[in-house]
Design a protein with these regions (language model features):
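Basic, Lys/Arg-enriched alpha-helical interface segments
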Residues: 1-142, 150-170
Length: 170
């Protein structure tokens, strides 16, 4: 169950979005969840393949609240923190960890390459760098949400959710 204090911290949106978020944690199917996310997280952009590996998280009903908590925080404060810290990823990830109890990291110490993904947006192709990710529940887990801090050309530089699932391996 998502704690009320976390909801109060994150739900600064209008009542309609709050109500939609209340009901999205009750779905038992990732397809249903995917069909609802854009209404619940209006400040996030979801890559067309964001949910391609979501089954790697395990049973939907077991992870839905934690997944939703992460998306709420990224939607409600992620971009604001990124702008506040002048695009300093390290500072933003530290604040997300300490202030919002969101386990996250950027490029790992053993990662030689960047994780890149292309996105089509309004008949244009863009290359995204997707190293930052949150980790569901604990620091040492393969359950992750990979994202990009956004691009000016795509919906006002909103965070782009690129991959939800296990550890990204190319």
């Amino acid at each position: 169950q998502i704690k009320d204090t976390e909801l109060e911290k994150c739900w600064k949106m209008n009542d309609i979005v709050s109500i939609k978020r209340f009901f999205i944690v009750k779905v038992n199917d990732y397809n249903d969840y995917e069909n609802r996310v854009r209404d619940c997280f209006p400040h996030l952009v979801f890559h067309e393949e964001a949910f391609k590996f979501v089954d790697e998280l395990g049973k939907c009903s077991d992870v839905i609240e934690e997944l939703t908590r992460h998306l709420i925080i990224l939607n409600d404060v992620g971009k604001k923190l990124y702008d506040y810290h002048n695009k300093n990823e390290r500072e933003v990830l530290l604040e997300l960890s300490s202030g919002y109890d969101l386990v996250c990291s950027g490029k790992g110490s053993n990662e030689e390459k960047r994780f890149n993904k292309e996105i089509n947006y309004k008949d244009q192709r863009y290359q995204l760098t997707c190293n930052p990710h949150t980790k569901l529940y604990k620091k040492r887990t393969d359950k992750r949400i990979y994202f990009c801090w956004g691009r000016d050309e795509i919906e006002g530089h909103n965070i782009i959710i690129v991959r939800i699932g296990g550890h990204w391996q190319e």
